[in-house]
Amino acid sequence: RDCLLSRGLGDVYKRQVYYKISESGIMQRRDLMAEQRELIIKLGQKITDRIGVKVTTEDPEYWGLAGVVTDEMAEVALGMKVRVPMTLEQVAKKCKKSVERTEQLLQEMSVIGLIEYNWENEDRHKQYILPMFVPGSAEFMVMNGRQVEEHPEVADFFEQMSRLPLEKVTPMVPPGGAGIGMHVIPVETAIPATPESVSIEHISYWLNKYKDKYAVGACSCRRQQRVRGEGTGDIEGDLCIGVGDMADYLVETGRGHYADIDEVMAILKRAEDNGYVHQITNIDGEDKIFAICNCAVGVCNALRTSQLFNTPNMSRSAYRASVTPDRCVACGRCVQYCPTGAAKLGQKLCTKNGPVEYPQHELPDTVKWGPEKWDKNYRDNNQINCYDTGTAPCKSACPAHLPVQGYIKLASQGRYMDALKLIKTENPFPAVCGAICNRKCEDACTRGTIDQAVAIDEIKKFIAEQELHESNRYIPETVNHEGKQFEQKIAIIGAGPAGMSAAYYLRCKGYPVDIFEKEKTPGGMILNGIPSFRLEEQVIEAEVDVLRKMGIGFKCGVEVGRDITIEQLRQQGYKAFYIAIGAQGGRKLGIAGEDADGVIAGVEFLKKINPDEKSAHIKGRTVVVGGGNVAVDVARTALRAGASEVTMVCLEDRASMPAAKDEIEEALEENITINNSWGPKEILTAGGKVTGIVFRKCTAVRDAQGRFNPQYDENDTMTIECDNVLVSVGQSVVWGSLIEGTKVELNPNMTVKADPVTYQTAEPDIFVGGDVYTGPRFAIDAIAAGKEACESIHRYVHKGHSLTLGRNLRQFPSLDKDNLAIEPDSYDNAPRQACHKKTDENGLTFRDLRSTFTEEQVKKEAARCLGCGATVVDPNKCIGCGLCTTKCEFDAIHLSRDIPEASTMRKSEDKMKAILPYMLKREIKIKFKKDK
C-alpha cells in the first residue's frame, strides 16, 4: 500500500491479490486435470452458472468435483435438476439404479456436499436437491473438514465459483442483490422496530420463523481462506447458523450440531462484539432463508462480491450509516469495526477555505465498469483509518493512537469507568503512563496553537487512578470469538511494558499466556529504571494485578536462556514467543578511567536504589553524564540517595536537551547544576577511585546529515572534581544466553532484526518488541508495540493466516493545524488547569509529590478540548450492517433506511427479471452521461 511505501516498507509487505491459488491446491489440480472424465465435465456444465462457458478439465467446475465425486455419483446427479427437490424413488428412476444403491450414493454425496436435503412438502417427506455451486455445494464441500484437508483444491474451487460467475454481472445488479448469494441484515439494535422497517430486515423475524430449528457449523469462508493461506486472523469456528431444513442437513451430514435459541443469540452477540457482519442467504425469495452467517470481510466470499468489484448492491441492506458531527469525538471505534472502510476519521474543524469536502466512492450506476474499477486489494484498503486530510493531532501523535477525544468527553460526563475501558482498548497501563508519559499528544494538541495544550495526560491520570483501588478494577473478558479459550500457549519473555501489553491483549483474545521475568517482580524498566518519585510501585502493582486477575501467569526469577531455554519451552507446548526484555544495560563512554571505582552506569544505579532504606546509598560529589530523561532521573535519585551535590553535563545545549522540559525544570528546582555543550574526555582517578572528570567543549552534536557525530574544541576543557560519575548516555540490550540456538539475528547495536510490520524475527515463532527492537524509547512506544505483536502472534499460531493481509496498519495522519479557521467564540476560554504538589516535610522524598486533578478540574480542562476530529461515512461504501452503532459510546452514528428497495429478496431463478430492467436503465444513464 502507498502508506507502506512511504514508510520504506515496500519490500517487506507482499501484496496478495484476490485470485491466489493455494500451493497444495495447484498440485491437486494438476493431477486431476491430467485425466478427462466426461461425466464430471457434464456435471460441471450442468451446475455452473457461468454464462457461455464450455467446461474443460482446466475449469474449476471440473477439478473442483473430480477429486471427490465418482463417475457413479455423477450419473446420479446428472439425472437431477439444479435446485429441484426429488424423492429417492424419482432419483433412482432417473439414474436407472436400484433404490437401495441410489440411497447409498445420495447419502455419500450428501456427506461430500454435492447433495442437500429438503422436507418442504405437505407430508414432510425427505427429498434431495442438487444445489448450485454458490451458495451451495462448494460451501458444503468445504464444511466437510476432513475432506478439505485431503482435497485442498476444494477450497480453491469455492473461491473461484464465488467469483468467476459474477465478474461481468455485478455492475448490473440492482439493490437487493437480485437473488444472488447473500444479503446483509443489520444488527437488530441498530434498527429498532419502526413503521419504516419491514420484518425481513430483522434477525428476530427469521429466528422466530424457524423457531427451535437451528444448527451451528464451521464457517466455510474462514476455512477456505485458511486452507488457501489467505487467512486474515479471523479464525474458523462454529459461527454459521443453519435454520429449518438446513439445520437437519448440517447435523445429519456431520457438519454441525443442533443449537437452542440461547446458543444462537450468544453467537450473534459475540459476532457483533468481534465486528462480524450478519448476512442471510438470498436465493429463495422473501419467504425463505437457510442460513445466517457472521462474516469477516477479510475472508468472506459473499462480502467480496461487493468489495472486490466495488458494487455495494451485491451486499448492502436497506440502511446506511450517518454521523452526527456534534456528538462524534473521533474515538475511531466505528472506523476500526467498519468492514468496508466506509467510516473513516476526518476533521470537524473548518479549514481557511471552509469545511473539508470528503470524496465519495465511485459507483457503477452511470459509468462503464470493468476490471480497472475493481479493488483487488480491498482487504488492505478497507483497513485505512483516515482520509488523506487527516484527523485529530492528539490521536495521530500518540504512538498507541489512544482515543483522546473520546476519553476526555466521557470524563467530562463523569463516566470514568467507561473512559477507562476506552483507554484500555489501546493502552492497558494508563496509570503508569499518566505518571511518566512523554505526552506527544499534548505537543501536537491544536489548542496549543491558541494558548496552551489541553492537559490530556492529567485527565488520563485522573481516569486511571479510579482503578488503583482494588474494588474498582476493570477486568476485561478473556474469551475468543467462540466464547472459549484458544489452546495455543504463548510465552512472553520480559515483564516490561511491551511484554505485559502483548500479554494483556493476547489474553483478551482468549490465549493462555505466561510471562517469564528474570527479576523477582514484574515491571521491567518502569519498575527498575524509573525512580519512585516519578512512578510509585503501588501504581505499577495495581495495573499488574489486573493482568493476574485476567489469568496471566507470572514466572518471576526465571531467566530464559540460563534457567530454561526457548527450545525447552517449545517442548512444554508454547507455540510462540515474544521477546521484550528491554534495553536494561548501560552504555560506556569509551574514555580513560571508566573502570575506576565510583563510575556506575545510570540504569544500574537506579536498579540498586531502594527508597525504603533510610541510609544513604551514595556519598559525595556526583557528576551525571547525559542529558536525557534517564539522566535527569539518575541525577534526582542521586540527590535523594545521599549525594552532597549533583551536576549534570551533556553534549546538547539547553534547548536541544533530549530530556522533557518539565523534568529539566524539576532538576533545576532541586538545585541540580546542568552544564550544557560539554563532552567527557577523561575520568581522573587516584588509587583506582574517581577524583574528577575532564570535559571538552562540544561545538556540534550532529553533522549536516543529522547523524550523531559530535565535534569538539579540544582547547576548551572543563574539570569537575567529584567522587562519583554516573553514566547515562544510552542503554543497551543484554541478551545473555536467551537467543542461543535460535536463528534470531542482531544488528550491530545489538537490537534485533525483525519485520517492521509484524515484528517477526528470522525464527518464525519468535517475535520481538519494545527497546530490544527500536532501542531505548518511551513506555507508550513499547505498549503500542506489544499490541501489534499480539496481532502477529494471533495470526501466526493459526496455520494458514497471513501476518499482513488485511491488517490494520494503524496509520493516523494529522490534520493541517496551519490551515484551520478557529473562531474566538467557538471554544472555552478557560486557562489550562494545573496540578499542585503534595506537601511533604522532606522535599527530596522518594514519594511522588505530584497531585492529580480534582473532579472539577477534569471537567474544566475537558471543556478546553476543541474536538478536532470526527468520523465521516461514505454512503457509497456503506453496506448498512450497523456494527458501527454497537461501538459508539456517544450516540453519534445511526442507520437510516435510505434504500428501501435493497430489501427486495428474489429467488435465484428470477434474477434476470431484476437484472435486465436495471441493466437497461443503467445503459441509458451511461449513454446519456456520455452524450452530455
Residue ranges and their predicted role:
Residues 124-163:
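Short, amphipathic alpha-helical interaction segments positioned at domain boundaries
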Residues 402-412, 453-457, 492-560, 587-592, ...:
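Beta1-alpha1 glycine-rich phosphate/pyrophosphate-binding loop at the start
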Residues 595-619, 702-776:
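FAD-site-proximal beta/loop scaffold in flavoenzymes
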Residues 67, 97, 128, 279-292, ...:
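Ferredoxin-like iron-sulfur electron-transfer modules
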Residues 772-797:
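A conserved FAD-binding loop/helix module that cradles the flavin
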Residues 340-393, 408, 454-456, 460-489, ...:
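Flanking helices and flexible, charged tails adjoining ferredoxin-like Fe-S electron-transfer domains
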Residues 463-484, 542-562, 586-641, 746-762:
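Glycine-rich dinucleotide-binding loop and its adjacent helix/turn
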Residues 1-16:
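Single conserved hydrophobic/aromatic residue that forms the stacking wall/gate
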